Amino acid sequence: MKTFTAKPETVKRDWYVVDATGKTLGRLATELARRLRGKHKAEYTPHVDTGDYIIVLNAEKVAVTGNKRSDKMYYHHTGHIGGIKEATFEEMIARRPERVIEIAVKGMLPKGPLGRAMYRKLKVYAGNEHNHAAQQPQVLDI
């Protein structure tokens, strides 16, 4: 018996919508990364993007445990000398709540072209509205 290998043109991708209200950031991100990769499917193949599209709503209402709301730091560099910037979780949620989930999930995906293709299937929105109704997403309870 031969080993099954999924082909990119035959992979069936579904659309799912997830409500992040009250969900713990890391636990939510691991499940999102798993589904973006396609590891929940029987036809999973490591070198083929077999994952589904995920829409995350209410990113501003995601929860963290302990003192992470004030202690967790996010860093980025502007590219200029001495241009390291930092922001706490609270500041990130106030400024760009979508980025918190995007950063958490992106760190759990493979690095390289395949990981970038998987990351592009993640759509995160701060509020309760999204513009993907035409794709008829199914509600995914995590």
Curated annotation (Swiss-Prot):
UniProt-listed GO biological process terms: negative regulation of translation; translation
Coiled-coil residue spans: none
The keyword Ribonucleoprotein is assigned to this record: yes
Signal peptide, first to last residue: none
Keyword presence, Chaperone: no
Keywords from the named record: Ribonucleoprotein, Ribosomal protein
Gene3D superfamilies xrefs: Ribosomal protein L13 (3.90.1180.10)
GO annotation, cellular component aspect: cytosolic large ribosomal subunit
A GO term, aspect molecular function: mRNA binding
Purpose: This protein is one of the early assembly proteins of the 50S ribosomal subunit, although it is not seen to bind rRNA by itself. It is important during the early stages of 50S assembly.
Subunit architecture: Part of the 50S ribosomal subunit.
PANTHER family listed in its UniProt record: LARGE RIBOSOMAL SUBUNIT PROTEIN UL13M (PTHR11545:SF2), RIBOSOMAL PROTEIN L13 (PTHR11545)
Recorded family membership: Belongs to the universal ribosomal protein uL13 family.
Protein name (Swiss-Prot/TrEMBL): Large ribosomal subunit protein uL13
Species the sequence originates in: Cronobacter sakazakii (strain ATCC BAA-894)
High-level lineage: Bacteria, Pseudomonadati, Pseudomonadota, Gammaproteobacteria, Enterobacterales
